[in-house]
């Protein structure tokens, strides 16, 4: 029980911080944190809640299938399946899914992936090579959640990572809440920098890659 309370507090603090950045517009987004490994349980945001508010109903505890462990009227977020795929296939401890203008714009500029390189902040992703290059996959935003989940699952390759969903935000996971938040911040910085650089250079009309 102590672990549950500790993880609840940790997730609540992350929610507050990401809210101050307006990364949960119009109740969008969902976040989760692992509570136990055997059996697998994790806390996840309840569906349709205003994440700018802090209430006792912010999160609910679910199992490895995303089913509530305790009797509740709350519903887990619609994309809970993405979280279950991550927790069932990795040792990740926290998953963050947010919608920002920048990460949505990026998915409209590129088709299957966005490549970013030669930025110092890439080291926040535990990549230490000089002039490092990263590739972030982009998948289609299927309304059929099981299809979305299956396409997403194909890109889960370790205990930390990220996947962009076209016009539907980014999902980032890490070893724990600190690692996941650090990675999310790094990706959002890279997206913002990339878009600003394109605008200075003339954008897609002057040769930058585009997807439509």
From Swiss-Prot:
Cofactor(s) annotated in UniProt: Zn(2+)
Pathway membership: Amino-acid biosynthesis; L-methionine biosynthesis via salvage pathway; L-methionine from S-methyl-5-thio-alpha-D-ribose 1-phosphate: step 2/6
Name used for this protein in its record: Methylthioribulose-1-phosphate dehydratase
Top EC class of this enzyme: lyase
Role summary: Catalyzes the dehydration of methylthioribulose-1-phosphate (MTRu-1-P) into 2,3-diketo-5-methylthiopentyl-1-phosphate (DK-MTP-1-P).
Any Pfam family matching the protein: Aldolase_II
Subunit structure comment from the entry: Homotetramer.
Transferase keyword on record: no
Species of origin: Bacillus cereus (strain AH187)
Cofactor note: Binds 1 zinc ion per subunit.
Family the UniProt entry places it in: Belongs to the aldolase class II family. MtnB subfamily.
Residue sites binding Zn(2+) per the record: 97, 99
Key word Nucleus present: no
Alphabetical UniProt keywords: Amino-acid biosynthesis, Lyase, Metal-binding, Methionine biosynthesis, Zinc
């Amino acid at each position: 029980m102590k672990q549950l309370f500790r993880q609840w507090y940790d997730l609540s603090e992350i929610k507050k911080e990401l809210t101050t950045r307006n990364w949960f517009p119009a109740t969008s987004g969902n976040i989760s944190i692992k509570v136990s490994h055997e059996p697998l349980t994790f806390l996840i945001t309840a569906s349709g809640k205003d994440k700018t508010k802090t209430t006792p109903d912010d999160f609910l505890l679910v199992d490895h299938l995303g089913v509530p462990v305790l009797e509740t009227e709350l519903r887990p977020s619609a994309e809970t399946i993405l979280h279950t795929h991550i927790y069932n296939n990795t040792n990740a401890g926290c998953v963050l899914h947010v919608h920002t203008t920048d990460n949505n714009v990026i998915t409209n500029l590129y088709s299957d992936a966005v490549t970013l390189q030669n930025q110092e902040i890439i080291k926040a992703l535990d990549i230490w090579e000089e002039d490092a290059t990263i590739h972030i996959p982009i998948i289609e935003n299927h309304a059929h959640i099981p299809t979305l989940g299956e396409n997403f699952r194909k890109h889960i390759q370790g205990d930390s990572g990220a996947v962009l969903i076209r016009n539907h935000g980014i999902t980032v996971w890490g070893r724990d809440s600190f690692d996941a938040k650090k990675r999310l911040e790094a990706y959002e910085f890279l997206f913002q920098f990339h878009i600003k650089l394109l605008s200075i250079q003339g954008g897609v009309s002057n040769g930058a890659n585009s997807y439509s």
